[in-house]
């Protein structure tokens, strides 16, 4: 009970200290279209309420939110308040709950048969009987989207998976994620849903944790399996791109969710949060992120986004 109470207290502190964009602020910028489920982006507005650029980026993701976190303004929105399956974006919340509970990162955790059930679409290089530290499991869940690592983190939580999922939903509620529901720690269930608005709050909260920042943006990591080392790579190719300054990121995919990508990045000196849900095609989410970056850079260089 003491640890569960700590989870709630720490989650509340994230909400109060780490999320400068209120739900009211986001809704004000998106209600023109998202409440009706429209699939075209609303005209972006500055923090002064002025319209910016007519030629918005041609994005292929079904739900999009682009926030200028530095100036607390919505730059682009499409169906941002619609709850959708979020796949492995879930693992950001999994990491946040584990780290908020202050469980020891050096504690060894064995991968068991319970972690192998995975479900359809699940792929993992972690075999039953392997033992990794909790820190390694978080690292692999965030960087390589390891489903068995995420499941083991939830299973080893005080009270097991039911208590862990309860803590995930409690933290979501405290962060103001009103369209969010979690049923598993890996994101393999299509019942894990959230809106782009909600995920922007999760990204901002996660970015306050240095462990999440580091692990989610590492390019590669290796763990020992008996006498051999297993190499893992980041699922987000953008972390390898030197033109990007990514602070935190997470990819996701299941059939019901499409390709998903969330990130916080510095673009032209501004902290920008990008949420892309339900993209189809192997490279669509990456291409959309690049289009957004190019668009923000262009509007800044043309003075169409205010600097004050």
Each predicted region: which residue ranges?
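Active-site-adjacent loops and short helices of periplasmic peptidoglycan-processing enzymes
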Residues: 24-29, 33-197, 201-210, 267
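Domain-terminus/edge residues, biased toward the C-terminal soluble/receptor-binding domains
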Residues: 177-181, 189-308
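Intrinsic disorder/low-complexity segments
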Residues: 12-15, 302
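Positively charged n-region of N-terminal signal peptides that target proteins for export
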Residues: 1-5
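C-terminal segment of classical bacterial N-terminal signal peptides
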Residues: 16-23
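N-terminal export leaders
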Residues: 6-11
């Amino acid at each position: 009970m003491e640890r569960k109470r700590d989870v709630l207290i720490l989650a509340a502190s994230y909400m109060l200290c780490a999320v400068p964009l209120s739900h009211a602020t986001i809704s004000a910028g998106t209600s023109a279209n998202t409440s009706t489920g429209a699939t075209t982006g609303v005209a972006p507005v500055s923090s002064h309420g002025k319209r910016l650029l007519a030629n918005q980026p041609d994005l292929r993701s079904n739900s999009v939110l682009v926030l200028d976190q530095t100036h607390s303004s919505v730059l682009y929105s499409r169906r941002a308040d619609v709850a959708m399956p979020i796949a492995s974006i879930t693992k950001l919340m999994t990491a946040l709950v584990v780290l908020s509970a202050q469980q020891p990162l050096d504690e060894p955790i064995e991968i068991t048969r319970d972690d192998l059930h995975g479900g359809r679409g699940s792929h993992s290089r972690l075999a039953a009987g392997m033992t990794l530290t909790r820190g390694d499991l978080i690292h692999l869940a965030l960087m390589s989207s390891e489903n068995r690592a995420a499941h083991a983190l939830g299973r080893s939580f005080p009270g097991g998976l039911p208590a862990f999922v309860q803590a995930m939903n409690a933290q979501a509620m405290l962060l103001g994620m009103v369209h969010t529901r979690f049923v598993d720690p890996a994101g393999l269930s299509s019942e894990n849903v959230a809106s782009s608005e909600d995920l922007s709050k999760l990204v901002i909260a996660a970015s306050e944790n240095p462990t999440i920042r580091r692990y989610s943006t590492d390019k590669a990591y290796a763990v020992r399996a008996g006498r051999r080392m297993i190499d893992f790579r980041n699922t987000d190719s953008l972390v390898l791109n030197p033109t990007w300054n990514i602070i935190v990121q997470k990819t996701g995919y299941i059939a019901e969710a499409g390709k998903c990508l969330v990130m916080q990045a510095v673009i032209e000196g501004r902290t920008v949060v990008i949420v892309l849900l339900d993209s189809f095609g192997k490279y669509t989410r990456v291409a959309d992120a690049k289009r957004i970056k190019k668009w923000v850079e262009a509007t800044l260089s043309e003075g169409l986004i205010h600097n004050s």
